[in-house]
């Protein structure tokens, strides 16, 4: 999952899957903004609608993240502690998008093969993660973010039957690339360190050099 955070006041201009990062940031903001926004409900509404945003990697993790953050799986639900959302998602997005296939029958964004049933099925999620399946990640929320925190999926087990995880196709570097495009002041991603050895399948040398 990916989590986005803007400071208060917002300057001119993705926890793990259960939304823990967002929840812990919210707890600190509730304390830190007490003098600026003394009314608790006003403070909650401001933090959840103006400062904290997330992208879930599956529908299930979107529901878990909203429950962790808003105390309700729907942001505008009866039990949500934020009382000004007018949609189910709030600021925790999940869109079940599809892969975009090129002439080689591979996704032009993440590189998975159309020959694998998991990624071309129409009735279930296909793991076309929204953040990396766009050329313009900044348009997902149309905002400038000060901080981006992520715990992205590490890899696709594409044709890997050896049990050697280093031979699976890495995708975590794509999340780092997209986050850097958004030019946050701070970027923190939980990713494996294997890229340093240049031995991970799918990670180009150019990306390692840039890191």
Task: For each feature predicted by the language model, list its residue ranges.
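SAM-dependent methyltransferase catalytic region
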Residues: 1-211
């Amino acid at each position: 999952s990916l989590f986005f955070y803007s400071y208060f006041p917002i300057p001119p201009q993705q926890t793990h899957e259960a939304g823990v990062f967002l929840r812990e940031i919210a707890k600190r903001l509730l304390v830190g903004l007490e003098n600026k926004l003394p009314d608790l409900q006003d403070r909650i509404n401001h933090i959840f609608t103006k400062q904290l945003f997330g992208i879930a990697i599956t529908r299930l993790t979107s529901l878990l993240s909203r429950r962790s953050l808003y105390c309700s799986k729907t942001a505008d639900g009866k039990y949500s502690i934020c009382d000004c959302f007018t949609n189910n998602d709030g600021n925790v997005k999940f869109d079940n998008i599809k892969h975009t296939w090129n002439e080689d029958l591979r996704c032009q964004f993440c590189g998975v093969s159309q020959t694998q049933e998991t990624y071309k099925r129409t009735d279930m999620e296909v793991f076309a993660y929204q953040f990396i399946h766009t050329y313009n990640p900044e348009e997902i929320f149309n905002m400038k973010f000060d901080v981006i925190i992520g715990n992205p999926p590490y890899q696709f087990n594409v044709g890997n039957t050896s049990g050697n995880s280093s031979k699976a196709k890495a995708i975590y570097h794509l999340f780092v690339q997209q986050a850097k495009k958004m030019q946050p002041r701070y970027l923190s991603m939980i990713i494996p360190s294997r890229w340093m050895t240049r031995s991970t399948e799918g990670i180009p040398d150019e990306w390692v050099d840039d890191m």
